[in-house]
Structure formats: structure tokens, C-alpha cells
Amino acid sequence: MTYVLGLNAYHADAAACLVKDGDLIAAVEEERFRRIKHWGGFPSESIRYCLAEAGISLGDVDHVAVNSDNSANRWRKLAYVLTSGVSLAYVLKRLRDRGDRADVAGNLKRALPEQEFRGTVHAVEHHLCHLASAFLVSPYDKAVTVSVDGFGDFSSAAWGLGEGGKLTVDGRVYFPHSLGVFYEAMTQFIGFPHYGDEYKVMGLAPYGEPRHVERMAEIVKLKNDGTFTLNLRYFRHAAGDGANYTVKDGIPSGGRLWSDALSELLGAPRDPAQPLEDRHRDIARSAQATYENAFFNLLDALHRRYACDTVVLAGGCAYNSVANGKIFDRSPFKKVYVQSAGGDAGGSIGAAFATWHKVEGDKARRHFVMDHAYWGPSATPDEIATAIAARRADFDAAGCTIERMGDEAALCRRTAQAISEGKVIGWFQGRLEWGPRALGNRSILGDPRRSDMKDILNLKIKRRESFRPFAPSILREAVKDWFETDDDVPFMMQVFKIRAEKRQEIPAVTHVDGTGRLQTVTWAGNPRYARLIEAFRDISGVPMVLNTSFNENEPVVCIPEEAIDCFLRTKMDVLVLGDTFIAR
């Protein structure tokens, strides 16, 4: 029996997972415990959870695998420092960071002083972890593997071929050239300054026109071999000035990546307090188009090289679900897989599985497929009952009724009826989702038929930008009737066109460009959620519900107490906690 603990540590989206004999047992991001979005640091609480879920201690763990290797690309780093004029302060900061990253065993001892780790620590190169996280848990025996992000271990992109349990890394793009840096710089320029705000640009883009694509072709230069370079005149990170990434009290932040030359090219940047104007929307649309041009230039080259019709994706840029949804139309690939945590958190999965295959050697046989995302903490019926009892006075003050329903079908019918009446539902079930998407276990649900549902959700709960779309969860067998595709999308990692004749029926989940970021729901993957959607279909004729994350400007709720708190402080109408139906 071999246990491998995988970590994304010392960086944003800190996370841990546990693999036992090639099977994933548990995986969770640290932010869910610390209650700070994208929490960065050492994931001690995530480690505790993973060990508890398996019923073991740190002493039972044979290997700890971290998704970063300080020694990777060492000579390239040295050559760059000696020739590029990078600032001394930046070099010294990186050296200090290296010391902390190298002391994994020490950090484990400090985080869990009552437990002793006697195994081996493995530092696994960042992009190898991304590639492994995409391929080694995919349903495919052979696939082109692609990782694109900001930076990790001095690379910003990597690719290779996965076959069986083997994985090659055949090419890279190195610092300072990066599609992730380009997109983050444009995100900052448009006035979204926080770590992880890139999804806002993706949502804003369809409201604009691609007026700046030709100008941006001077920023991101494409090569015939599929690679790309940045015109460094428009960026500050190459000398370390804009790359001063920091984590303070768990909150990650980065310096300004774009240079003054970018404002000469595109006009003045937007202040975050300034209202959005058409020119900001045009910049967003152009940035998305520029990213897509580079992304598909790379994919086309890789398809020519490998002559394989399957591609698996990871890295932070794998969250660009709009581009992912165009792969079938704009590239020769015919099959796509992106696991539910494609970014750095998911690197812990890659580190663990790559290490398991390495240490087991020829004995390792791939058998695990990540076909659902439910790998986090759950709550027992007793824990739910205790949490409700502790807030009984608050429920009474809010005029709530509380009923425990032992019949799952009746619970789903009652919830579906409430959705059809325009009510907003907090839905808390089973194990927490792995990755940033709510996928039917920690979700807020609504009626996709209501044109006012977006406004209702933003008014009652989310209080977010009006341009951001809400997503549909749809029964898998109904996809072809509602979307211009018929594919498995279990993790909301692809955006597809909704059929033109159906868009007016589901305005709440139809974006301005006629698309939806769907989640396909199966009875095998999430039977209770499938039963709920089926019940809503029986009432409405529509085999989907609106699904957004169960939170209010915070990490997704993890435990019943957080779900109750969110319900009571917002204007949510119904809270379904396991088998308990709570209504105002």
C-alpha cells in the first residue's frame, strides 16, 4: 500500500490531495478552510482533512510531492539573471522564497507537530505537474498534453505526449514570454486588479468588438512552430518590476505587469472605480481574441506534430472556458479533457500521480479517471442537525420553516417546485467540489427561464458585475437538444453555443453572445442533483437549472455553519441542507 500526499504550497490556491495506490482519496483547496479567496501558503488544514478522510496519520504517508522544483531550468535562470538586467531586489526575494519552498519536511513538522513524517519528499517540476494532472487522471490512453499559465519554474507553457502511464515533455516557452502574463496584464489594464480576476475579462469580452486585435498582434507575436513571444516593451515583469508576487496574511497579489507603452497603444487604463465604457469592452474582446489566436496557433502545431486527435489541458489558462469551447471548431482536435482544478491547485494532483507512477515504476497501472469533482469534506446528518439547532433562534427570527424529508424524490420535487416559482435555493449536499466551480453540491440554484433571474441573484446574494454570466447545469442526455454540441462537460470548463431556437427559453443562462458555460450532469456522477434537475424538467419542460457558487464574495461554503450563515445574511429563499428543507 502506497500513500502519496500531493501539495500546491507557498503560492496562491494552496491545496492538498491524497492518492492511495493510484486512486484519488481526497482533494481540497486551503481557501475553503481559511475563508480567504485564493489563499496562499502552506496548506496545513487541507493536509489534515486529506489524512482524516483516509483515516491515516502523516506517519502512514510514504511520499510527499510538491508541484515545484527549485532546481528546474537552473542554468536558464542563471543565464537570464546575468544577461537581462533583472533587479537585485527581485533576485534576493526569489532566493528567500527558495529557502522556504525547500523546507517541506520542516513545514510539515510545524503544521502537524503531533504527527511524524518518515517518508520521502519529491519536488516535481511545475509544468510536468500540470501535464500529469491533465493526462494521468483523464479517460484517454493517449493524448497530446498542453499546459499554459503565467509562470512556474521559469516556464510559461509546456507540451508533450501522454501514452499509457508515460508522459513526455517535448517543448516549452520560457520566462519572460507568457500568455498568462499577457492576459493578466490586460485584466489589470481594464481595471480588475485582484488576483484571479481574469474570468471577468472573459465574461466582459462578448460585449465589445475586436477593434484592437491588429495592435495586439504587436504585443503577442506568433511563430510558425506554434510558440509565441511577448513584445517586452509593453510589460514590466521581465526585469522583475512587475513580477513582485507576494502573499500577505494568505492574500496573494502581484505588481503591475503592463508598462506605460501599453497606454500609448490602447489609451488610458481604467481605474477600478471608473464605470466600464465601450472602449474597455473592446479591449477585453481584443485580448480574448489575441489569446485565442495564440492558443490555436499552438494547438494546430501540436496536432501536426503528434497526429493525435485528443488533447488534455491544464495550467491557469485552462480556465479560459471560452477558448476551450472553440477547440472543435478552430483546431483539428476531436476530444478534449480538462480536470476540475486546472490551475495551480490541480498541480497537487499532478505531483501526486506523477510521483506514484515514478516510484511504482512498471508496477503502476493507470486505472483512476477523474469523472467527477466531489473530493472534499462532507457533513453527516448529525452534523447538519447540530448546526441547525445552534441557529434555531435565528431561523425563528427570520420566519423560517424547517422540515427534514426522508424521501429523496419528494425533497427534489419540492425543491424543483420552489425553483419553478422563482425562488433562490441554497443547495448543500455531499462532498465539496474540487476546483473553483460549484457543480451541484455547494450551489445556488435558480430558474433558467426567468429573464430577471440574473438581477434577482445579484440583488439578493451575489452583488457582482452585471456583465458576468450565470451557468446552466443540464442533464447529459439533453445536451444535443439545447446546445450546438453533444459532449461531456462535467466540470464547466467549456463554453458552447446554445441553439438559436432555444435561447429565448433560457435567458438567465444565455450570455450576450448566445453561449452558455454548461455542466453536464449524469446519474452516475451526482444522482441527487440529476434527480433534482429531472424533477424540474418534469415541471417546466426544461432539463436544466441555473447554477452558481454557494457564496457571497467569499470562498464557496464548506461546512453547514457557513451555508446557514450565508443563507441568513442574504435574501435567499430556501436552504436545502442534506435532507433538510428550510424556507423563509
Can you annotate each of these PLM segments?
Residues 285-311:
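Phosphate/ATP-binding catalytic cores across multiple sugar-kinase/actin-like superfamilies
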Residues 1-5:
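Extreme N-terminal starter segment of soluble prokaryotic enzymes
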Residues 290, 314, 318-320:
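A general "terminal functional-core" signal
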Residues 45-53, 64-68, 532, 540-542:
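Short HxH-centered metal-ligating active-site micro-motif
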Residues 270-284, 288-293:
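Helix-hairpin-helix/helix-loop-helix acidic hairpins
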